[in-house]
Amino acid sequence: EIFMPTEFLHGLYDGGHGAGLYDYWEMMRKHPRCAGGFLWVLADEGVKRVDMNGFIDNCGNYGADGIVGPHHEKEGSYFTIKQVWCPIQIRVDSLDSQFDGKLRIENRYDFLNANTCRFTYKYVQLPSVTDKGGMKVMKQGEVNCPDIPAHGVGTLTIPAAMKGANALLLTVTDKNGNDLFTWSYKLEDIAGLQQVSAGNKPSYRSEERRVGK
């Protein structure tokens, strides 16, 4: 039997699409009989009321459950879904100013080699809370993904952290030129920002039971 839940997360007012998706997906990936799953739903549903000056009527809370809004505006969970389901994953949680340019990456494609993708890197200087200017790009470039077969892991090499940059942006692009995801890493403490602990990650256990046993 193949397990493929038709609605394992519901996004009412963006309260459920991204929340918990990582835990569900990591558990589902470990079971060979799991073929994937469905999120409900892609876009907020509503009727444009001509008698209310174009107001989008969601019939209370029955239709505001999309990954994107009624005008296809991206909601918070949109970016979480892109990250969790990105076929190329960076297996690094944090970096610092001593970053040597090497990153462990995982190819989650079922058939494609990772070398069909490219990475764009940007070393940037983010402004402090009192700065009036915007983000400054200190150095940028492109590199090919290394030769990593489907479901394999390997090392991506980019130039090491440069002096003056306090953050790194990494964007992976597929063979068709589609941006799959952009990661951002803090390299140095940014003036005016307070460090906040992320807390402990949740844990889970899984077991399989046969009906009638």
Protein language model regions, located:
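Extended substrate-binding grooves/exosites of carbohydrate-active enzymes
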Residues: 1-104, 108-116, 120-137
